[in-house]
Amino acid sequence: MSAAASPRSLTLIGAGLAGCLLAILLSRRGWQITLYERRGDPRIKGYESGRSINLALAERGRHALRQAGAEDAVMAKAVMMRGRMIHPVSGEPQLQRYGRDDSEVIWSIHRAALNVTLLDLAEQAGARVHFYRRLHTVDFDAGYARFIDDRDDQPHEIHFQALVGSDGAGSALRAAMQRKAPVGEHIAFLDHSYKELEIPPRADGGFRIERNALHIWPRGRYMCIALPNDGGTFTVTLFLPNEGMPSFATTRSGDEALALFARDFPDALPLIPQLKEHWEEHPPGLLGTLTRERWHLDGRAVLLGDAAHAMVPFHGQGMNCAFEDCVALAEQLDAHSDLSEAFAAFEAARRDDAAAIQQMALENYLEMRDRVGDAQFLLQRALEQQLQARWPTRFVPHYTMVTFLRTRYAIALARSEIQREILLEATHGHTDLSRIDWVALETVVHARLEPLEGAH
C-alpha cells in the first residue's frame, strides 16, 4: 500500500460466511478490518439466517479455510458424505459414490455452526465486528456510510476507505452501488421453490438413516434431499414447482404435505415427525441466479460471493465459490497497492468462473431430480468411471473437477461438455459396456482432452 492509503483498512458489509473468512485472511495480512452486520450476534441471540440449507464443503472451500488457518476448527463440526443415497418410491436405497474412495468425499456442515466458528476466528485475528448495523445509505464520494440499528432506529455514521459487500444475495451495498451507478443487475428465478424440514436423531442420539451420505428422493420435476448434521439430525429440503401438480400451489396445508409425502416419499414420512407443524411454520424459499455487469465501483466498493453472483444450491458450490472469492480478493490486494486496480483485477479473475458454476448449478438440478435413477445415466456413469481408471489425467469426471480438485470452474465446464459428448456417443444404442470400442475411445479421449493439471 502507498503511504497515502495507510493504514490499510477495509469495511466489510455482512458478517456471514464470506465476510468472516475474508476478515480472517486480511487481518492476518495486517489489514484493519471492521465488519458491520444487520443481525444480532449469533453467539448470544441464536442463529437468525432464515435459511438453514446445510452446506457442502468441498476442496475449494477447504483450501480457503487452510489459507485462513481455520480448517481444523471447521472440520471438527463437519460430517463426511461419500455420495448420493438414492431413495426410489419403492425398493432399497442405493449409494452412488461421488469419487473413487474415501479420499474423494464432501462434507456437510450446518450454516450456523460454521458462521459462529468463523466469527470467533475473525475476532481472534483482530477484526472488529459491530452487530445490529443495517446499511442504510452510502456517500461514496465523501466516504461516509450510515447504518441503522433496527432495535431503536438509531443511526450510526462511519467514515470508510473502501467497502466490501459480503452481505449476500439481497446485498444492501449492491443496492447502494446501483443507486450511484447502474451495475447491470439481472435476477432469473427458478419456477421452483424450497421448504425446510428436519429428521430428528434417534432416542439414543444416533442417526435415523445412513449418516455419511447426501440422501436424495428424486421424483422427476421435484425432489427431496437430506444432509446430515453432527448432532444426529438431518436437514431436509423439499424442492417443488411453484405451480402445477404437485406444487406449492397445491400443497399449502400441513395435511396436504402429509399426503404428498405418503404418496411420493413413503420411507421419508416416518422420519419427519414434525412435518405438519414445520410445513405450516416455514414459508417457501426462492431460488434464483443473480448476475451483474459490474462488481466494483472504482476503488470505493467491491462485491463478492452471493452479493456478486448468487446461484441455485444444487451443486453445493455457493459457499465454496464465495470462499474462493475471498482468497482471490486477498491475493489481488497483495498484488496491487491501488484499490481500484485490485478490485478490477479480482473481478476479471473471477467473472468467467462465477458464470460457469452458476450454469453448472442449474444443470446439476436437472441431473439430481430427473436423471440419477435413469438407466442411461447410470450407464454413462459406469463408462465415466472406466475412462477415468484408464486415462485418469485426461478423462476427469465433472464432479471430480468441481468438487475434489480446484480446476477453474470455466475450464471444468468446457471439459465437461466435451466429456458429455464422448459419453453420449459411446453409449448410444448400448445397454451395458460389453461392446464398447475401447481402441476408438482411446483415440477420441487423447485427441479431445489434454492432461488436466492436478488430476491423478
From Swiss-Prot:
It catalyses: L-kynurenine + NADPH + O2 + H(+) = 3-hydroxy-L-kynurenine + NADP(+) + H2O. GO terms for molecular function: FAD binding; kynurenine 3-monooxygenase activity. It comes from the Bacteria. Its cofactor is FAD. Transmembrane segments: none annotated. Pathway: Cofactor biosynthesis; NAD(+) biosynthesis; quinolinate from L-kynurenine: step 1/3. One of its GO terms (biological process) is NAD biosynthetic process. It is an enzyme of class 1 (oxidoreductase). Its EC number is 1.14.13.9. Pfam families: FAD_binding_3. Keywords: FAD, Flavoprotein, Monooxygenase, NADP, Oxidoreductase, Pyridine nucleotide biosynthesis. Gene3D superfamilies: FAD/NAD(P)-binding domain. HAMAP family: Kynurenine_monooxygenase. Belongs to the aromatic-ring hydroxylase family. KMO subfamily. Catalyzes the hydroxylation of L-kynurenine (L-Kyn) to form 3-hydroxy-L-kynurenine (L-3OHKyn). Required for synthesis of quinolinic acid. This is Kynurenine 3-monooxygenase.
